[in-house]
Swiss-Prot record:
InterPro entries: 2-IPM_HCS-like, 4OH_2_O-val_aldolase, Aldolase_TIM, DmpG_comm, DRE_TIM_HOA, PYR_CT. It comes from Mycolicibacterium vanbaalenii (strain DSM 7251 / JCM 13017 / BCRC 16820 / KCTC 9966 / NRRL B-24157 / PYR-1) (Mycobacterium vanbaalenii). It is an enzyme of class 4 (lyase). The record marks 13 as: Transition state stabilizer. Its EC number is 4.1.3.39. It catalyses: (S)-4-hydroxy-2-oxopentanoate = acetaldehyde + pyruvate. GO terms for biological process: catabolic process; L-leucine biosynthetic process. Mn(2+) binds at residues 14, 196, 198. HAMAP family: HOA. Pfam families: DmpG_comm, HMGL-like. GO terms for molecular function: 2-isopropylmalate synthase activity; 4-hydroxy-2-oxovalerate aldolase activity; manganese ion binding. Transmembrane segments: none annotated. The active site is at residue 17. This is 4-hydroxy-2-oxovalerate aldolase 2.
Length: 337
C-alpha cells in the first residue's frame, strides 16, 4: 500500500518568528506563488502566534493578518489557504473574517494539556465547512497516553485531524513514534494524524519520517526550514526522503529548492540553524519562539542567552509567558537563583 503524505507549508506562519513577523505582502505573495507552483497541499499564513498574535508580548507584525492572507489568497490557485488560531488570542469573529478572505483550513492550537479550551473554535470552524485540525503544542510535556486523551477531546469537538506538535524541538524519534501510535489507538480511523517538528536537536526530518512510518499522514514543513528556533522540518530534504521511500505527494523538489534559496534565505536577519542558542532550546525543552525574546533580553541585561533558556526550561514556561523571560534575565543578572 502506497503511503500518501499531505504536505503543509508553514513558512508564512511559523516562519514569521524567524523574521520577527516582519515581511511585506509582496514577498508573502512571492513565497505563496512559488509554493503553489511547487505543489504543496496547503499554505499556512498568519502572525507567528496565529490570528491576532501581533502584540507587544508576542511581537508586533509589520502588517496585519488580513494583508498577509489577502496576499496568499491572491497568489495561489491549487493549494489550500490555511491559518492558525490560539483560543484566547484569536477569536471566532476573526476566524469568520479569515474565511471571508479565502482561508479554508484552520489549526486550532492549545497547550498540550488544555484541549478543552478549543471546543468553541473547532465547532465554529466545522460549521463554516473548514478543514479543521487540533494542534497540541509542546507535546513533549505530556506522556503519550495523556496527550492522546487530549487529542481525543479535540476529535470529539469536531477536529478532523490532530497534530503531535513538537514546539520545543525536544522529541526524539521514539518519542514521536510513541505519541503517534497512542493517537492511533484512541482516534477514529477517519481522523488523520499530523506531525509538526522543529530542528533544535537536528531531528526534524527524522522525526517527521518516524511519524509517517507510525501512521501520520500530515506533515508540516517549511522552505529552508524557516521557523522558530532552529526552524521547522525543512521541506526540501523531507520531500527528497519521501521520494526515496516512494511516498506519494504532489511536490516538485527542484521548485522547492529554488524557492528556499532564491526567495526565503535572503529575507533572514538571523540564520535559521542549529547553533548554541537553538540547540539549548531543544535540550531544555523550551518553546522555540522564545529564542528571539531571550536573545533580546540577553543583549539588554548582559546575560548568556543559554542561561536564560535553561532557566525557562527549568521553570516549565509555555507559550504566552514571554514576559517572564525579562524577569528571568533580571534575576540572573542580579545573581538571584
Amino acid at each position: 500500500m502506497t503511503t500518501t503524505v499531505y504536505v503543509q507549508d508553514v513558512t508564512l506562519r511559523d516562519g514569521m518568528h524567524a523574521i520577527r513577523h516582519r515581511i511585506s505582502p509582496r514577498n508573502v505573495a512571492r513565497i505563496a506563488a512559488a509554493l503553489d507552483r511547487a505543489g504543496v497541499d496547503a499554505i499556512e499564513v498568519a502572525h507567528g502566534d496565529g490570528l491576532a498574535g501581533s502584540s507587544l508580548s508576542y511581537g508586533p507584525g509589520s502588517h496585519t493578518d488580513w494583508e498577509w492572507i489577502d496576499a496568499v489568497a491572491g497568489a495561489v490557485t491549487n493549494a489550500t489557504v490555511t491559518t492558525l488560531l490560539l483560543p484566547g488570542i484569536g477569536t471566532v469573529a476573526q476566524l469568520d473574517e479569515a474565511y471571508r478572505r479565502g482561508v479554508r483550513s484552520v489549526r486550532v492550537a492549545t497547550h498540550c494539556t488544555e484541549a478543552d479550551i478549543a471546543a468553541q473554535h473547532i465547532a465554529h470552524a466545522r460549521e463554516l465547512g473548514m478543514d479543521v485540525s487540533g494542534f497540541l503544542m509542546m507535546s513533549h510535556m505530556a506522556q503519550p497516553a495523556d496527550l492522546a486523551a487530549q487529542a481525543k477531546l479535540m476529535e470529539s469537538f469536531g477536529a478532523q485531524s490532530v497534530y503531535v506538535t513538537d514546539s520545543g524541538g525536544r522529541l526524539t524519534m521514539h518519542d514521536v513514534r510513541d505519541r503517534v501510535l497512542a493517537y492511533r489507538d484512541v482516534l477514529a480511523p477517519s481522523t488523520q494524524i499530523g506531525i509538526h517538528a522543529h530542528e533544535n536537536l537536528s531531528l526534524a526530518v527524522a522525526n517527521s519520517v518516524a511519524a509517517v512510518e507510525a501512521g501520520a499522514t500530515r506533515v508540516d514543513a517549511s522552505l529552508a526550514g524557516q521557523g522558530a528556533g532552529a526552524g521547522n522540518c525543512p521541506i526540501e530534504p523531507f520531500v527528497a526522503v519521501a521520494d526515496l521511500f516512494g511516498w506519494k505527494h504532489g511536490c516538485d523538489l527542484f521548485a522547492l529548492q529554488d524557492a528556499a534559496d532564491d526567495i526565503v534565505r535572503p529575507l533572514r536577519d538571523r540564520p535559521v540553524r542549529v547553533d548554541r542558542e537553538t540547540l539549548t532550546l531543544g535540550f531544555a525543552g523550551v518553546y522555540s519562539s522564545f529564542l528571539r525574546h531571550a536573545e533580546d533580553a540577553s543583549a539588554r541585561y548582559g546575560v548568556d542567552t543559554r542561561a536564560i533558556l535553561v532557566e525557562v526550561g527549568r521553570r516549565g514556561l509555555i507559550g504566552g509567558q514571554e514576559d517572564m523571560i525579562v524577569d528571568i534575565a533580571l534575576s540572573l543578572s542580579a545573581g538571584v537563583p
